[in-house]
C-alpha cells in the first residue's frame, strides 16, 4: 500500500549473513513531490536512546564516569530528585516523571518548539517522582534527557558533537546526526504525515531535543550501527556486553530492557530491538545475532506499524533457519472460573479505566464512560482480541484461583503495558457541590496555573494556551479530564472539608500538586 506517489512511505534495509539489501517506497515530501530513496533521512524517535546509552558507556570506558554513579555527581542541581544512578536512568527505573506529560500539563502544545534547556528546566523543577528510584520499571524519556546532559557536562561536547566524533563518523554513518537545533540543515529529510479520510496531512515535529529522541538517520545507516554490535569498530566486546545488561528492580529478576534495547524471545531466538514514534514518524530496529540478521524500518506515515514490518521480514527471511520455530497459539478456551477471575476494573493510565465483565460465556470490554460493552473473542484461555486489525489484545495470567491482579494491554509486537486492578466505589455525582471546587490552581513544579469554572453545568479547567478541558467525575472528588494534559484530577481537602488544592496524575507523571487560590 505504500508504493505510491500520493502518500508517505517506508524505507527498509535488511542484513543477513553480511549481505545488505534495501527497498524504499512512497514519498518523502508530498508538497515537493520527492520520493523516498536510500538517502532519505528520517526522524528515528526513541531509537535514539541506544545511541545515548552507548555514549555514556564510551565515557565509562574512558574512565570519566561509571554507570553506578549517582546522577548528582554530574548534575549537582539534580540532588533533590533522589538517589538516582545513571544505570537507573538507562534502564527506566529512576522514577522520574515523564517530560512529555509535564510539558503538556504546563501548557505546551504539539506544535510548540521544545528545546533541551526547556526540558532540563522542567525536570529540575520537580520535587518528587512517581516512585522511589530502583523500586519499579517505568519507561521514561526524562531519564535520557538527563543522560544527554551528563554527556555534555562530562565530555564538554553536545551529545551530537560527541556522537558524531565517536560513533557516526567511525562507523561511516554519513547521513546520521542528532538534531539539537531546528535551524540545522538536513538535506534529504522526510516530512511527517498523518492519515485523514481523504489522504494525508502534515504532522509537525518541533523537537530540538537530543537524548531520548532527536536522531535523524537512514535505514542503511542503522544497519551500519547494527553490525557494530557483532563486529565492533567502535567499542569492544566488554562494552557490547555492558549494552546487554538488563535492568533490574530490587527483589525481582532482570527485566527485558537493557540500555536502549529490549530483549525478547521470538520464534526460538533471542532478539534485540527498539522502536520509536514521534508525530508521523515510525521506526524499528531488530537484531537477531544468532542468525546474523538485522532489519531497520523507517517511515514518515503515522499509520505504519514498523515493528510488524520488521518481524514480518524476519519471518520470511529466517523461515529455514535451523533454530526458527513456527508460530504457535494455544487452542484452549477460558473456563467460567477464569472468566470470573478476569472480570473487573483495570487502570491502564490515570483515569483510563478498562472495565471487563462476563456473562459466564465470554468477556466484554468497555471504558466505563457510557460506552457499549464489546464482546472479546478469545483465541486462547488467557488472550482476548481487542482490535484484531491493529493486533491489540488483552492478556491475563492463567491463575483462576483468585481475581486477576492486572491485565496486559498488548500493542502488537511493540510490547505490553500493565494495567493494575482497581476497586471503584459506588458513586453518584453531586453537581450542586461543584462550585466549591472552582478557583485558580497554581503549580510551582509546572510553573503554571489553571482556572476551574462551571460552564453549562460542567466543571471546566481553563488554561491560556489550551482549549477548555471538561472534567468528568467518576469517584468522590475525582475527575477525568477530556484532554491528556489533565488526565486525572483528585481534589484535596483539609480537616474542615475545605478544598485546598488538587493532585494531578498524567500518563507516567503522577502526584503533581496544585494549590487552590480563591477566584
What are these regions (language model features)?
Residues 4, 8, 16, 25-141, ...:
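Active-site-proximal loop and beta-strand segments within enzyme catalytic domains
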Residues 66, 103, 174-177, 236-239, ...:
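Short, polar/charged, Gly/Pro-enriched helix-capping and turn/loop motifs at alpha-helix termini
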Amino acid at each position: 500500500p505504500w508504493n505510491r506517489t500520493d502518500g508517505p512511505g517506508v524505507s527498509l534495509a535488511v542484513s543477513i549473513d553480511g549481505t545488505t539489501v534495501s527497498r524504499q517506497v512512497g514519498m518523502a515530501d508530498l508538497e515537493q513531490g520527492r520520493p523516498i530513496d536510500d538517502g532519505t533521512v528520517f526522524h528515528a524517535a526513541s531509537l535514539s536512546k541506544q545511541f545515548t546509552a552507548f555514549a555514556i558507556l564510551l565515557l565509562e570506558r574512558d574512565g570519566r564516569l561509571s554507570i553506578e554513579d549517582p546522577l548528582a555527581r554530574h548534575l549537582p542541581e539534580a540532588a533533590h530528585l533522589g538517589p538516582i544512578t545513571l544505570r537507573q536512568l538507562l534502564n527506566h527505573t529512576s522514577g522520574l516523571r515523564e517530560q512529555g506529560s509535564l510539558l503538556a500539563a504546563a501548557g505546551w502544545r504539539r506544535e510548540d518548539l521544545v528545546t533541551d534547556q526547556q526540558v532540563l528546566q522542567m525536570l529540575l523543577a520537580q520535587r518528587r517522582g512517581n516512585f522511589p528510584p530502583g523500586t519499579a520499571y517505568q519507561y521514561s524519556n526524562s531519564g535520557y534527557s538527563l543522560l544527554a546532559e551528563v554527556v555534555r557536562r562530562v565530555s564538554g561536547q553536545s551529545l551530537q558533537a560527541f556522537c558524531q566524533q565517536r560513533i557516526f563518523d567511525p562507523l561511516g554513518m554519513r547521513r546520521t546526526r542528532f538534531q539539537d537545533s531546528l535551524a540545522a540543515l538536513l538535506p534529504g529529510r522526510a516530512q511527517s504525515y498523518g492519515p485523514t479520510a481523504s489522504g494525508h496531512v502534515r504532522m509537525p515535529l518541533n523537537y530540538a531535543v537530543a537524548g531520548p529522541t532527536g536522531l535523524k538517520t537512514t535505514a542503511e545507516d542503522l544497519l551500519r550501527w547494527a553490525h557494530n554490535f557483532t563486529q565492533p569498530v567502535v567499542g569492544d566486546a566488554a562494552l557490547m556486553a555492558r549494552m546487554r545488561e538488563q535492568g533490574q528492580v530490587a527483589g525481582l529478576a532482570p527485566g527485558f530492557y537493557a540500555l536502549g534495547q529490549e530483549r525478547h524471545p521470538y520464534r526460538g531466538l533471542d532478539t534485540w530491538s527498539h522502536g520509536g514514534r514521534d508525530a508521523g514518524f515510525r521506526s524499528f530496529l531488530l537484531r537477531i545475532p544468532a542468525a546474523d540478521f538485522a532489519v531497520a524500518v523507517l517511515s514518515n506515515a503515522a499509520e505504519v506499524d514498523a515493528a510488524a514490518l520488521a518481524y514480518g521480514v524476519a519471518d520470511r527471511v529466517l523461515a529455514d533457519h535451523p533454530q526458527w520455530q513456527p508460530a504457535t497459539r494455544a487452542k484452549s478456551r477460558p473456563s467460567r472460573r477464569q472468566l470470573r477471575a478476569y472480570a473487573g476494573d483495570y487502570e491502564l493510565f490515570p483515569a483510563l479505566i478498562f472495565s471487563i465483565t462476563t456473562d459466564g460465556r465470554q468477556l466484554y470490554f468497555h471504558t466505563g464512560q457510557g460506552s457499549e460493552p464489546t464482546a472479546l473473542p478469545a483465541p486462547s484461555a488467557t488472550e482476548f482480541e481487542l482490535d484484531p486489525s491493529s493486533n491489540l489484545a488483552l492478556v491475563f495470567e492463567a491463575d483462576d484461583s483468585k481475581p486477576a491482579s492486572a491485565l496486559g494491554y498488548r500493542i502488537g509486537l511493540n510490547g505490553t503495558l500493565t494495567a493494575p486492578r482497581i476497586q471503584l466505589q459506588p458513586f453518584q455525582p453531586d453537581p450542586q457541590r461543584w462550585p466549591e471546587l472552582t478557583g485558580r490552581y497554581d503549580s510551582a513544579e509546572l510553573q503554571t496555573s489553571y482556572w476551574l469554572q462551571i460552564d453549562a453545568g460542567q466543571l471546566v479547567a481553563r488554561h491560556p494556551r489550551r482549549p477548555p478541558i471538561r472534567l468528568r467525575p467518576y469517584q468522590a472528588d475525582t475527575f477525568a479530564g477530556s484532554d491528556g494534559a489533565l488526565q486525572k484530577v483528585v481534589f484535596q481537602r483539609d480537616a474542615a472539608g475545605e478544598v485546598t488544592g488538587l493532585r494531578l496524575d498524567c500518563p507516567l507523571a503522577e502526584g503533581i500538586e496544585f494549590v487552590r487560590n480563591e477566584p
